[in-house]
């Protein structure tokens, strides 16, 4: 089987690359080998949702009046995102006559893999794991790590519901704690002059301001906003996982992309809608191939708060080996 004939994670891509349908498990499988190689294993996944989820709505008065707590700017941003994803779905249906598929077949196990493994983890080629907390490994990272073309972060944002789940990346209590945690990362010293920083955020409005305000985190790192990518979560039917107009739950997550202040923006870096059926909790699509289209195939990446390794990249966090245990994989025959 040649590289071109293997099952690609890309199910559809518009000519201008502003709209793409990805299969999340396949992005993980592709990330386990270098770009010129063919994946050798399949990852254990969750059953894909066949239909949208019911969306609990808040009360319309008192403490449940969500609109009273949202600034006009945040409301406008939500409306713009809703319009963007609605337009993307309309383009898929009308402009491109695309009706599926929205995912590939998945390797499902009736019983989830055990939380702890007695077998050594599977390590991709040229992957550099830093398994430990930001606080514990900061000095080691600072003294040994190179400069990166891309840094991807998926921080444990404050979230009450997530705190009830078993997750080594315990969510912080508030944004002040998050600022203290993230500012311990010597990111500016390890970003190339034209490097990019891409950060996953939740839909809590204060987080966007926390990053991009004049006194926000990006400014502290000497960065400025370039663009945003939106992951639109859909069921296998292609319908958004939650009602786009829902007040309380949104069917998307944002990836905020920044560069050094004053540096040149890559010509290929533009807004993007990524349509993908979600997998197990906390699993994001691997972004290596998408950013290679922007930065070139030789770009060196670092993923912070990683839950798996990527061939050719560095990964740092308490759970870098979480999905590298053999129980999560099956060899391709």
Please give the residue ranges for each predicted region.
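Class I S-adenosyl-L-methionine
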Residues: 1-153, 158-182, 204-333
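Short, basic/hydrophobic alpha-helical segments
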Residues: 180-191
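Conserved beta-strand signature within the Rossmann-like core of class I S-adenosyl-L-methionine
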Residues: 193-202
């Amino acid at each position: 089987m040649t590289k071109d004939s293997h099952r690609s994670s890309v199910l559809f891509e518009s000519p201008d690359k502003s709209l793409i349908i990805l299969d999340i498990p396949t992005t993980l499988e592709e990330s386990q080998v270098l770009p010129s190689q063919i994946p050798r294993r399949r990852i254990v996944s969750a059953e894909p949702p066949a239909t949208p989820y019911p969306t609990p709505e808040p009360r319309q008065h008192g403490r449940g009046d969500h609109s009273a707590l949202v600034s006009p700017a945040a409301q406008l941003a939500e409306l713009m995102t809703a319009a963007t994803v609605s337009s993307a779905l309309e383009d898929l249906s009308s402009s491109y006559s695309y009706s599926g598929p929205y995912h590939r077949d998945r390797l499902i196990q009736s019983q989830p893999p055990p939380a702890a493994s007695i077998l050594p983890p599977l390590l991709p080629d040229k992957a550099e794991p830093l398994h430990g907390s930001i606080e514990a490994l900061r000095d080691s990272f600072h003294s040994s790590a190179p400069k990166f073309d891309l840094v991807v972060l998926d921080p444990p944002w404050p979230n009450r519901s997530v705190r009830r789940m078993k997750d080594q990346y315990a969510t912080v209590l508030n944004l002040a704690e998050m600022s203290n945690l993230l500012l311990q990362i010597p990111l500016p010293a390890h970003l190339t002059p034209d490097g990019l920083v891409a950060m996953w955020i939740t839909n809590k409005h204060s987080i966007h301001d926390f990053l991009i305000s004049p006194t926000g985190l990006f400014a502290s790192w000497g960065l400025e906003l370039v663009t945003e990518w939106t992951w639109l979560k859909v069921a296998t039917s292609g319908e958004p996982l939650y009602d786009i107009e829902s007040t309380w739950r949104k069917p998307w997550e944002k990836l905020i992309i920044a560069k050094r202040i004053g540096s040149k923006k890559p010509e290929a870096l533009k807004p993007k809608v990524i349509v993908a059926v979600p997998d197990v909790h906390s699993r994001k699509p691997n972004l290596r191939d998408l950013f290679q289209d922007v930065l070139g195939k030789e770009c060196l990446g670092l993923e912070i708060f990683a839950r798996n390794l990527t061939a050719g990249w560095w990964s740092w966090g308490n759970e870098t080996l979480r999905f590298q245990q053999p129980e999560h994989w099956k060899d391709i025959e």
